[in-house]
Amino acid sequence: MAFENKIVEAFIEIPTGSQNKYEFDKERGIFKLDRVLYSPMFYPAEYGYLQNTLALDGDPLDILVITTNPTFPGCVIDTRVIGYLNMVDSGEEDAKLIGVPVEDPRFDEVRSIEDLPQHKLKEIAHFFERYKDLQGKRTEIGTWEGPEAAAKLIDECIARYNEQK
């Protein structure tokens, strides 16, 4: 049986091109400006998370969705997960899922991070390697993993979330 990519609902907090880091306050049901990036850098893709997951850093599992155009905070995108970036942020593992919109025909053939232009992967890695430099915080970029590893990571984060409930 052939592998099928995971399809998830990505809850977007930060649109592509933004320098503002928004976070959703679940208790109050509002988006709050967490901070403006200290560095003159911009988010290279839609940035959000998967609801009902718990990553190793204690937050929901992060996801970047590569889109044709920016969306808005609160947008939910049906997303085909194509891999993830291993990284460490302030000493904690902080994987970043990578996906593409199911409902955009420009990405119909994209099933793996290998289907993206290598330059796009370099942009994403560079952003996360440098975006906290002027805050004096360190991040470390690890390896890229494919869709099968991403599916396993999602399942682990769902199980961790369910154990914490």
UniProtKB/Swiss-Prot annotation:
EC annotation from Swiss-Prot or TrEMBL: 3.6.1.1
CC per GO annotation: cytoplasm
InterPro entries reported for this sequence: Pyrophosphatase (IPR008162), Pyrophosphatase_sf (IPR036649)
Domain of life (superkingdom): Bacteria
Residues holding Mg(2+) 1: D57, D62, D94
Keyword Cytoplasm listed: yes
Location within or outside the cell: Cytoplasm
Residues holding substrate: K21, R35, Y47, Y131
Function recorded in the entry: Catalyzes the hydrolysis of inorganic pyrophosphate (PPi) forming two phosphate ions.
Assembly with partners or alone: Homohexamer.
Record-given protein name: Inorganic pyrophosphatase
